[in-house]
């Protein structure tokens, strides 16, 4: 009988080693709600764009279609990035952290990733006990969602 693959075993793997996705997929660590945090990063600039949640079906759809799909906790439904705004994310690479409990999505983002119209959701920095806004919207959010 073969031993089940674990993320702990992957720690000992060497660069270039490959493992069957079906075996790895069984070890992904979802939270009690069946979700895993997914961080989207622009593949070429490496700018961190956003963090959202995926469930197993959203992860599978993303891998199959190449377009990023998340799970919306507030709407309790699938959220295919760009469905309403047209600002899609095309998957370039998908990586798990060492524990298998977080995902890094390297994406090609069309336009802003943030619902505020900014390229990144991470536009507020804290310095000297002050919250400083780092960027302006590149698209008016009203125009972005045609409200």
UniProtKB/Swiss-Prot annotation:
What is the UniProt remark on how the cofactor binds and its stoichiometry? Binds 1 Mg(2+) ion per subunit. Binds 1 zinc ion per subunit.
**Matching InterPro entries:** PRA-CH (IPR026660), PRib_AMP_CycHydrolase_dom (IPR002496), PRib_AMP_CycHydrolase_sf (IPR038019)
The coiled-coil segments of this chain are: none
EC top class, as a word: hydrolase
Cysteine disulfide partners in this protein: none
Quote the record's binding site residues for Zn(2+): 98, 114, 121
Tell me which EC number(s) this protein carries: 3.5.4.19
Q: Which GO terms describe its biological process?
A: L-histidine biosynthetic process
Reactions performed catalytically: 1-(5-phospho-beta-D-ribosyl)-5'-AMP + H2O = 1-(5-phospho-beta-D-ribosyl)-5-[(5-phospho-beta-D-ribosylamino)methylideneamino]imidazole-4-carboxamide
List the subcellular locations.
Cytoplasm
Say yes or no: keyword Cell division present: no
Task: List the cofactors.
Answer: Mg(2+); Zn(2+)
Coarsely, its chief localization is cytoplasm
For this UniProt record, give its keywords in alphabetical order, as a comma-separated list.
Amino-acid biosynthesis, Cytoplasm, Histidine biosynthesis, Hydrolase, Magnesium, Metal-binding, Zinc
| Highest taxon, organism lineage | Bacteria
Residues that hold Mg(2+) according to the record: 97, 99, 101
Function, as annotated, reads: Catalyzes the hydrolysis of the adenine ring of phosphoribosyl-AMP.
Could you give the subunit structure recorded for this chain?
Homodimer.
PANTHER family named in the record: HISTIDINE BIOSYNTHESIS BIFUNCTIONAL PROTEIN, HISTIDINE BIOSYNTHESIS BIFUNCTIONAL PROTEIN HIS7
Q: What is this protein called?
A: Phosphoribosyl-AMP cyclohydrolase
What is the native source organism of this protein?
Hydrogenovibrio crunogenus (strain DSM 25203 / XCL-2)
